[in-house]
A protein has these predicted regions:
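Histidine-centered active-site/metal-ligand motif
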Residues: 46, 50, 150, 238
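Short, conserved beta-strand segments within well-ordered enzyme catalytic domains
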Residues: 15, 25-29, 52, 76-78, ...
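Short, Gly/Pro- and small/polar-rich lid/capping loops
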Residues: 1-10
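His/Glu-based metal-binding/catalytic segments typifying zinc-dependent metallopeptidases
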Residues: 18-20, 27-29, 212-270
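Generic preference for hydrophobic
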Residues: 14-16, 28, 186, 241, ...
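Charge-rich, well-structured scaffold segments of protease-associated domains
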Residues: 7, 63-213, 229, 246, ...
């Protein structure tokens, strides 16, 4: 059954896909994340995500957590550079409970001072964990290198100093400025009719007043490649290289998504993995990644290896990039790349929580939301020349930033 999009009486958008599953998923997705913090608010978006569950006007922190767990459900949240998600998975008979709970959390969280201080300790431990995990830390530091001086480069967790200075007043101000009407979407995939879900959402979300004041984002411009080598107490070298790429609205995003998957995506058969790990055993881990934001994107290659293998690995990476820039995919290669990506997306879409989050994400950025079939058709329409064009525009080592931990 296709998804449906409905506007509630207060203008809030709801996207829902009806299923016959015994398990359902419902979420509140906000188009606000790390890049929307001021220079003195580092880590605030993530801290809001942590502390919004710490009690409401009518629920203690325990009652918030136990509300869904008592019926076998789960309550979760996540923060990224541009979005914050609050969502729950639950037996489909518990839709009223799920919708009411998320509305209560979202509109009536109290952020008690005592709970804020406790959660600061938790986040500081999280920051220390990442500092001790170079394979995680390098991703954050690489974004800071590429987006130097721009909010997209800021660490999602913040710093120890910035977290310690977060205040309840700052939290309330951030929510008021960023959790605005056109920045919020309700998303659902589950066993309930659209008509009944709309009634529930009108009951618990429809009467709330939500600010609709626009909030401009600082655009990212004037990228300059940088190379940085840092010495750390580690046994392996960790390397990242890459540059800005296409934003979420650009047509070139789809052929580049296909190209990235072929080059170093999920499969063990990716070109980078076959060349560096499988054939030569020079690295334990190698991958490429592509993330699209609202006004830019990021392409990166990551690998970890013994220090003596670092330069040979770099040479092999550049050779693979040369091949893919100078040789158009043949008919069989292109068909295989499409088949692999389509299959991966189909498997991911089988997880209905992922489908709910994907629908909500699309609703945040697009007026019209593609069906799964329409997304697949976009991939199938990609030509070998389009792949070659995006390869030559993005996969150029002269515009790469490079970060090395050794």
């Amino acid at each position: 059954m296709p998804h449906r999009v409905v506007n509630l009486c207060n203008g809030l958008r709801l996207v829902h896909k009806e299923t016959d599953s015994p398990i359902s998923h419902f979420g509140v997705l906000v188009n606000a994340g790390t890049r929307d913090e001021s220079s003195r608010q580092m880590g605030l978006a993530h801290f809001v995500e942590h502390t919004i569950f710490k009690g409401t006007a009518k629920r203690t922190p325990y009652r918030v957590i136990n509300c869904m767990e008592s019926v076998g459900g789960e309550l979760n949240a996540s923060t990224s550079k541009e979005e914050t998600y609050f969502h729950t998975s639950f037996p489909s008979t518990e839709y009223p409970r799920a919708v009411e709970l998320l509305a209560d959390i979202f509109f009536h969280a109290t952020f008690p001072e005592k709970e804020l201080e406790k959660e600061k300790t938790v986040v500081l431990e999280e920051i220390n964990y990442y500092k001790d995990t170079p394979s995680e830390l390098i991703f954050d530091d690489f974004e800071d290198l590429v987006f130097a001086g721009h909010p997209l480069g800021k660490n999602i967790l913040g710093t120890a100093r910035s977290v310690k200075h977060i205040s309840r007043e700052g939290i309330i101000d951030f929510i008021h400025q960023n959790y605005t009407l056109d920045n919020i979407v309700l998303a659902s995939v589950g066993n309930i009719s659209t008509q009944r879900l709309v009634r529930l959402c009108e009951r618990f979300f429809g009467d709330e007043e939500i600010s609709d004041s626009p909030r401009p984002r600082q655009p990212f411009t004037n990228y300059q490649p940088h190379t940085l080598c840092q010495r750390k107490k580690i046994t392996q070298a960790h390397v990242m290289l890459g540059c800005p790429a296409y934003n979420i609205h650009e047509d070139a995003r789809v052929p580049f998504l296909l190209l990235n998957n072929l080059l170093g995506g999920q499969g063990m058969s990716s070109r980078l993995n076959m060349s560096v790990r499988e054939r030569r055993g020079l690295a334990y881990s190698i991958e490429s990644n592509y993330t699209s934001f609202s006004d830019t994107g990021l392409f990166s290659i990551y690998f970890s290896c013994e220090e003596p293998h670092r330069e040979p690995c770099m040479e092999l990476v550049y050779k693979e990039l040369d091949k893919i820039r100078n040789n158009a995919l043949g008919t069989i290669q292109l068909h295989g790349a499409k088949k692999q990506l389509v299959g991966q997306l189909a498997l991911a879409n089988e997880a209905k929580l992922n489908e709910m989050l994907a629908l909500g994400h699309s609703a945040l950025f697009f007026e019209e939301i593609d069906t799964f079939e329409e997304s697949i058709a976009e991939i199938e329409a990609v030509t070998a020349m389009q792949v070659l064009d995006v390869a030559n525009e993005i996969l150029r080592p002269d515009q790469f930033s490079i970060l090395i931990f050794k």
